[in-house]
Amino acid sequence: MDVPGVNTTSANTTFSPGTSTLCVRDYKITQVLFPLLYTVLFFAGLITNSLAMRIFFQIRSKSNFIIFLKNTVISDLLMILTFPFKILSDAKLGAGPLRTLVCQVTSVTFYFTMYISISFLGLITIDRYLKTTRPFKTSSPSNLLGAKILSVVIWAFMFLISLPNMILTNRRPKDKDVTKCSFLKSEFGLVWHEIVNYICQVIFWINFLIVIVCYSLITKELYRSYVRTRGSAKVPKKKVNVKVFIIIAVFFICFVPFHFARIPYTLSQTRAVFDCSAENTLFYVKESTLWLTSLNACLDPFIYFFLCKSFRNSLTSMLRCSNSTSTSGTNKKKGQEGGEPSEETPM
């Protein structure tokens, strides 16, 4: 997989893959600006996702929706834990062994968790579509078991295709300042790197289509419902539309730009198909869009809040507990077990 932000052979130069052409690159932006941006994401994401994990693991896994959300929280938190290594490496604050660790472990983990999050977002979208068309259907034990098995399969599949990227990053750097991860990969490691890139592209575009198709159908269904009931003035149309566009906005902002830039950038790392100027441009585009994918870990908690009643009620209960311990037991029970007809909102 691509390696986030680790791309130099020395302070300001690199060699094009397969050639001995020296390519000068200005790293001031990646050494100063991006470490600051990732530091902001790290603290914001660590706080919000730790809180989200605490809340979700107080909620019983009584629906496919909750199961998928819990997996997303774990994935986001793992991604966030890779940020400090990237920050130190990009800012040139770590020694050579740290940069090798980034190439071999933490950058691979970053992409591993990214595509797990994308996969579960696709499953959540399908679940929301089914919930909209069949709002009163509850999850049976067999459905819950199927959701758990599917979750394990996703984690196992991504781990199996990611592990070789760690193992095949096994060349010793000739220079202590070498941080371009492609130089640390074996010949087959470069081939596998490219193969996994295309696999991940397929994963993304499948889930992209799922999000577009399902939410188009959801919007159509909600509009029909609105037309049927608009006389009663009970349908919060504007609120529902906001919920629809939260998912689409997050997907477009965080993931689409990076996946348009990823294939040409990977080719620039593994093949001599671009000149120096193009390689530098692709590098800056990749770094910028990669930061947007990292932003997803901070935006997902907002999705949990708007889509999941159990999460929203538990958060409200937790906030009330900070002001009044006398009502904590009642609020917690309401948040987790709820007397509402559904534990989550359809959208």
Swiss-Prot record:
A Pfam family annotated for this chain is 7tm_1
Q: Which GO terms describe its biological process?
A: adenylate cyclase-inhibiting G protein-coupled receptor signaling pathway; adenylate cyclase-modulating G protein-coupled receptor signaling pathway; cellular response to ATP; establishment of localization in cell; monoatomic ion transport; platelet activation; platelet aggregation; positive regulation of monoatomic ion transport
Q: Which UniProt keywords apply?
A: Blood coagulation, Cell membrane, Disulfide bond, G-protein coupled receptor, Glycoprotein, Hemostasis, Membrane, Phosphoprotein, Receptor, Transducer, Transmembrane, Transmembrane helix
Q: Which residues lie on this side of the membrane: Extracellular?
A: 1-33, 89-103, 169-191, 266-284
Membrane topology annotation: Multi-pass membrane protein
Residues recorded with modification Phosphoserine: S61, S63
Transmembrane regions: 34-56, 68-88, 104-124, 149-168, 192-213, 240-265, 285-304
Molecular function terms, GO-annotated: G protein-coupled adenosine receptor activity; G protein-coupled ADP receptor activity
Its localization reads: Cell membrane
Give the residues the record marks as binding ADP.
99, 103, 111, 162-165, 181-185, 193, 197, 262-265, 269, 286
Q: Name one GO cellular component term.
A: cell projection membrane
Q: Where is this region: Disordered?
A: 321-347
* Membrane topology, Cytoplasmic segments: 57-67, 125-148, 214-239, 305-347
Effect of a null allele: Mice are viable and fertile, but display impaired blood coagulation, due to defects in platelet aggregation and thrombus formation.
According to the UniProt record, which cysteines are disulfide-bonded?
C23-C276, C103-C181
The residues that the database entry marks as glycosylated are N7, N12
| Broad class of where this protein is predominantly found | membrane
Question: What InterPro entries does the entry give?
Answer: GPCR_Rhodpsn, GPCR_Rhodpsn_7TM, P2Y12_rcpt
- Coiled-coil spans in chain: none
Report the function annotation for this chain: Receptor for ADP and ATP coupled to G-proteins that inhibit the adenylyl cyclase second messenger system. Required for normal platelet aggregation and blood coagulation.
Entry's free-text remark on domains:
The transmembrane domain is composed of seven transmembrane helices; most of these are not strictly perpendicular to the plane of the membrane, but are tilted and/or kinked. Agonist binding promotes a conformation change in the extracellular loops that leads to an inward movement of the transmembrane helices. Antagonists can bind to an overlapping site, but block the inward movement of the transmembrane helices.
Similarity comment:
Belongs to the G-protein coupled receptor 1 family.
- What is the official name of this protein in its record? P2Y purinoceptor 12
Q: Its encoding gene is what?
A: P2ry12
